[in-house]
Swiss-Prot record:
Record's protein name: Formamidopyrimidine-DNA glycosylase
Gene name in the database record: mutM
UniProt: DNA binding residues: H99, R118, R163
InterPro entries, per database record: DNA_glyclase/AP_lyase_DNA-bd, DNA_glyclase_Znf_dom_DNA_BS, Formamido-pyr_DNA_Glyclase, FPG_cat, MutM-like_N-ter, Ribosomal_uS13-like_H2TH, Znf_DNA_glyclase/AP_lyase, Znf_FPG/IleRS
Taxon lineage: Bacteria, Bacillati, Cyanobacteriota, Cyanophyceae, Oscillatoriophycideae
Cofactor detail note: Binds 1 zinc ion per subunit.
């Protein structure tokens, strides 16, 4: 699943390429990709003729403001890529990808395509005078953004203190820190020297501080490299992310640790894989 760096990469690409573009027409190829409104006719009626404004990221969600030609607010377009979703800015004449679910035609031979192999991704068209949180209910449950001032040592300590769950599982909880996923949780735990099985309640103040800083640094580095592509992720122009080749531990089971040379190990925690160095994270 695309995580914060991948979604942020897409967000920046959308701001660069779609801002000010008019959605002249649209085509829904898979109606169940529409979370709201579920009616294809209603979705098309709401989206035709509006203009893309600014895109923002909230956790792993993308929110694009929509405006009318008069400048009046026209709502929001929300997207969650889930496991395999892609938003691609392409020439309209380009052959259609087999898993294309939605096409937004923007004139000048350009279109924004939503491509999704496993069909878990969702699209929302939020009407004006309605907040995105009202329609996209998952937004209400999100924790703080890791780049915000709210992500402080005090906040993190409050969320981890007394918790009986292991830290890897806690980092994947979107109600604690929004946007973290399997890849960057492993990377941050390695960088902070914390073993993934450590219970939240057993983390010392210094470890919590180091982990918080590591989360921010790892995410910043991944964004600089355009995210990670291990299977399906691509930026809006179809370019793969480059973080994977420099990962500390994720996807490197059996390979030598880049710091100490010990073989990277993997274990299952809560149904998810955790990659770690048994020496650096002892």
């Amino acid at each position: 699943m695309p995580e914060l760096p991948e979604v942020e990469t897409v967000c920046r690409g959308l701001n660069e390429l779609t801002s000010g573009k008019v959605i002249k027409d649209a085509e829904v190829l898979l109606p169940r990709s529409l979370a709201s409104p579920s009616s294809v006719d209603e979705f098309l009626s709401n989206i035709r003729g509006v203009i893309f404004g600014e895109w923002q990221r909230r956790g792993k969600y993308l929110l694009g403001t929509l405006v009318k030609e008069s400048g009046e607010a026209a709502g929001w377009l929300g997207v969650h890529l889930r496991m395999t979703g892609q938003l691609l800015w392409v020439n309209q004449s380009e052959p259609l990808q087999i898993h294309t679910r939605l096409r937004l035609f923007c004139g000048e031979n350009k279109e924004l395509r939503f491509v999704d192999i496993r069909t878990f991704g969702k699209v929302w068209c939020v009407p004006p005078k309605t907040t995105p949180e009202t329609i996209i209910t998952g937004l209400k449950k999100l924790g703080v953004e890791p780049f915000s001032d709210d992500f402080s040592d005090d906040y993190f300590t409050t969320k981890l203190n007394g918790r009986q769950r292991n830290i890897k599982t806690l980092l994947l909880d979107q109600e604690i820190v929004a946007g973290l996923g399997n890849i960057y949780a492993d990377e941050a735990l390695f960088k902070s020297g914390v073993h993934p099985t450590t219970l939240g309640k057993n983390l010392k103040p210094q470890q919590i501080e180091q982990l918080r800083i590591a989360i921010i640094e790892v995410l910043e580095t991944a964004i600089e490299k355009g995210g990670t592509t291990f299977s399906d992720f691509k930026g809006v122009t179809g370019i793969n992310g480059n973080y994977g080749g420099t990962a500390w531990v994720y996807g490197r089971t059996g390979e030598p640790c880049r710091v100490c040379g010990t073989s990277i190990e993997r274990l299952k925690l809560g149904g998810r894989s955790a990659h770690f160095c048994p020496r650096c994270q002892a």
